[in-house]
Amino acid sequence: MSQSAVSFQISPVSKAQDPLIQQQIDLKTKPPGALGQLESLALQIARVQATDSQQTDQPQNTVLKIVHPTMLVFAGDHGIAAEGVSIAPSEVTRQMVQNFAHGGAAINVFCRQVGFRLEVIDCGILTPVEGVEGIIDQRLGAGTGAIHLEPAMALETVDKGFAMARDLIERHHQAGCNLVAFGEMGIGNTSAAAAIMAAIMQLDVIDCVGRGTGINSETLERKLMLIELALLLHQSALSGPKSVLACLGGFEIVQMTGAMLAAAERKMLVVVDGFIATAAALVAVQIAPNVRDYLIFAHQSDEQGHLRMLEFLQAKPLLSLGLRLGEGTGAALALPLIQASVNFYNQMASFSDAGIEAVV
């Protein structure tokens, strides 16, 4: 039975109240713009939440909220990893998924610290983890095809992944969540992300490929060669963003893309982590440009292609810490800044409230 095509209806955020929202920000007890990027972030969040509620209240009566923030970590294996494009073998994907489930990874530590709920989704690792609670089964296969030899997956598998992702987001939306963050785990997925980036942005592979988790120069050369072979092999089939995912993507990248689209469809805030998550966002924006309004980019990673993708998406990340771990770690660390932008908007006194002469 074939999987029917999945589409998303994503509304752009309303900018009708921008002048009033900006006035609300500017009248806080500070010089205009003194809170820097937190101010533009507050404006973005206010737009999204005003669009969601379709409220007619004046912005001064609007309270911004972050409710049940949830970190979704999508895991999948990649056929190209068998060619030695990473410092670790594919078996490490499964081992790290177990580590997530047992609470021992960096993402677990950071989620506990900042207040994220964490959910781990098996999108298609080589061997499923049996008998361990806390892993959601959304398997699309046992690892993708090796993209330099064959498509990563069938086009209908992309739609199946999108449908699964939409159901996942709907469950969290029904539970009241209004902010989801995206992380991943998959040995070889920087190769898939770099291939996606090169295909969509029409760049040379060398401008997209980095050292991932820290590969040496010999491995880097092999990685470059294999991605170039993949792009050459699939050149005639890369007719659109879904085809790019089918030919070059990963099961976890597919489901991240679908989940970002589904979250924007439900007018939820979407926090994007690093290089791989940004590649998923890149595809999502190609499918539905309005999704960009809902995306908050957490950080600029140490992966050399990430800055180019961020610039292409006109994104200014909140953090730049030299991270190259993935898992959603940068997105987790950005949550306190997102909450700070909400808190200053809601709680900071205006000049008139405080009896202070306005600073212009």
UniProtKB/Swiss-Prot annotation:
Q: Which domain of life is it from?
A: Bacteria
> What are the GO BP annotations of this UniProt entry?
cobalamin biosynthetic process
List, alphabetically, the Pfam families matched: DBI_PRT (PF02277)
Q: Which residues form the active site?
A: 327
Q: Which EC class does it fall in?
A: transferase
Give the pathway. Nucleoside biosynthesis; alpha-ribazole biosynthesis; alpha-ribazole from 5,6-dimethylbenzimidazole: step 1/2
**GO terms assigned for molecular function:** nicotinate-nucleotide-dimethylbenzimidazole phosphoribosyltransferase activity
Q: Which gene encodes it?
A: cobT
What is catalysed by this protein? 5,6-dimethylbenzimidazole + nicotinate beta-D-ribonucleotide = alpha-ribazole 5'-phosphate + nicotinate + H(+)
Question: Any idea what this protein is called?
Answer: Nicotinate-nucleotide--dimethylbenzimidazole phosphoribosyltransferase
Q: What does this protein do?
A: Catalyzes the synthesis of alpha-ribazole-5'-phosphate from nicotinate mononucleotide (NAMN) and 5,6-dimethylbenzimidazole (DMB).
Which organism is the protein's source?
A: Shewanella baltica (strain OS195)
Keywords assigned by UniProt, alphabetized:
Cobalamin biosynthesis, Glycosyltransferase, Transferase
Query: Hey, which family's this protein in?
Result: Belongs to the CobT family.
